[in-house]
């Protein structure tokens, strides 16, 4: 794999990933902006609205026909919340020219279509087409309501909302239903223009192609030429910037809903410590504690004590948090919470073996190796490094993991504190709303 990063202009970056291992090309436009309550719902609507039509292809059927002409390429868009930033993403997967009956510059046509959709939307009188806006407002309302139907996602997001009620990370990436009443085709287009002029834009092209040809195409594309330079407005979230404060008592929130299985989410803070680069120690700690079938959560909470149907933990490097997530019988709440506290103390006491460490390293390194096996995973990894301002090659990543010691993990465990315990239990029908 060869990776080239090129600044087209301030705030607009081209990333070329040249790899001969895949039969497809993957082309992505990421637009990143800070998470802010005022515009969160408008932001969520924009990808859905602009995929309905551009000036050249003024409805979704025409876009779809063009995509089909490109040997069955696939186009989609979406949203990601990364730390205190929101990422609007637009991507096309297409067959590489080398695997077509005859070479016809398929990738170049794909890129032209992608840039047309993102940067040249269908506009009427300085407004998006009203029909598309109203359609997508209804779809977004359904999507927001559907989050409550998936209790795993709902409980996890609710815990984050409680912990980060006063910051962008606590916002739902889909916004809220109340905002939809005030959104119209004109103010939504105004917000789109603001995002295009201020957001961080990253164009990533992965596949087997001629570097110079793609560079030239992007540089000479009129939509890209029309983009202005912009200042960096993103929030920088990484293990260095997210400094947690010590708290005396964790917050406990219990919510009742019509559920058959309780959902327990525990948010942990990573306090400042003397370890120089504890990301990799945190990854090891999290894996030993709760990420994988050999972890303490899985082996003890789920298998040995039969307290949980599901039990896992996740390290969120952007926010210096670890989240424990369990699906349990509601009457087993107290036992489960107490056992989890015991396991956290065991980690502080170094009650894990060198065999645990070695198995965990193998597990993590296997995951790192898989990053370069899928184009989308590789793209997301590289883009994550871009946002965090902490570039890290996968080989260096593996070496850092190999170097972690038991003493470091035990020392790191001292910096873990309980922040929030959230429990969704049976007993009610309606969930509380949050923004």
What would you call each of these model-derived segments?
Residues 53-56, 98-101, 120-129:
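Short, polar/flexible loop-turn hinges at active-site or ligand-entry regions and domain interfaces
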Residues 182-189:
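Active-site glycine-rich loop that binds ribose-phosphate moieties when present
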């Amino acid at each position: 794999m060869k990776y080239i990063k090129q600044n087209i202009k301030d705030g607009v970056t081209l990333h070329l990933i040249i790899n001969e291992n895949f039969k497809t090309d993957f082309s992505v436009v990421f637009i990143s902006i800070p998470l802010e309550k005022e515009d969160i719902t408008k932001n969520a609507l924009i990808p859905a609205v602009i995929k309905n039509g551009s000036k050249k292809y003024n409805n979704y059927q025409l876009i779809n026909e063009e995509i089909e002409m490109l040997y069955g390429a696939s186009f989609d868009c979406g949203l990601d919340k990364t730390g205190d930033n929101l990422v609007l993403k637009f991507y096309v997967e297409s067959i590489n020219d080398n695997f077509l009956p005859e070479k016809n510059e398929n990738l170049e046509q794909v890129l032209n279509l992608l840039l047309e959709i993102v940067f040249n939307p269908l506009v009427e009188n300085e407004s998006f087409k009203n029909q598309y806006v109203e359609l997508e407002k209804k779809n977004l309302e359904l999507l927001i309501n559907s989050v409550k139907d998936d209790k795993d996602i709902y409980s996890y997001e609710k815990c984050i909302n409680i912990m980060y009620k006063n910051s962008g990370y606590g916002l739902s990436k889909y916004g809220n239903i109340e905002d939809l009443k005030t959104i119209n085709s004109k103010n939504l287009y105004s917000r789109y223009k603001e995002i295009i002029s201020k957001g961080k834009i990253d164009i990533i092209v992965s596949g087997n192609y001629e570097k110079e040809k793609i560079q030239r195409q992007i540089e000479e594309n009129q939509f890209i030429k029309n983009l202005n330079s912009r200042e960096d407005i993103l929030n920088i979230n990484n293990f260095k910037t997210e400094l947690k404060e010590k708290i005396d008592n964790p917050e406990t929130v219990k919510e009742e809903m019509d559920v058959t299985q309780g959902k327990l989410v525990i948010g942990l803070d990573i306090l400042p410590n003397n370890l120089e680069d504890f990301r990799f120690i945190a990854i090891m700690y999290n894996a030993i504690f709760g990420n994988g079938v050999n972890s303490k959560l899985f082996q003890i909470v789920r298998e040995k004590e039969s307290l949980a149907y599901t039990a896992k933990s996740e390290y969120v490097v952007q926010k210096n948090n670890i989240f424990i997530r369990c699906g349990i019988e509601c009457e087993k709440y107290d036992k489960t919470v107490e056992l989890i506290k015991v396991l956290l103390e065991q980690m502080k006491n170094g009650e894990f073996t060198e065999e645990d460490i070695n198995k965990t390293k193998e597990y993590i390194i296997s995951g790192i190796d898989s990053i370069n096996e899928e184009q989308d995973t590789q793209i997301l990894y590289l883009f994550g490094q871009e946002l965090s301002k902490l570039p890290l090659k996968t080989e260096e990543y593996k070496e850092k993991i190999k170097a972690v010691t038991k003493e470091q993990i035990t020392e790191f465990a001292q910096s873990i504190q309980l922040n929030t315990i959230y429990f969704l239990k049976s007993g009610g029908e309606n969930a509380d709303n949050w923004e």
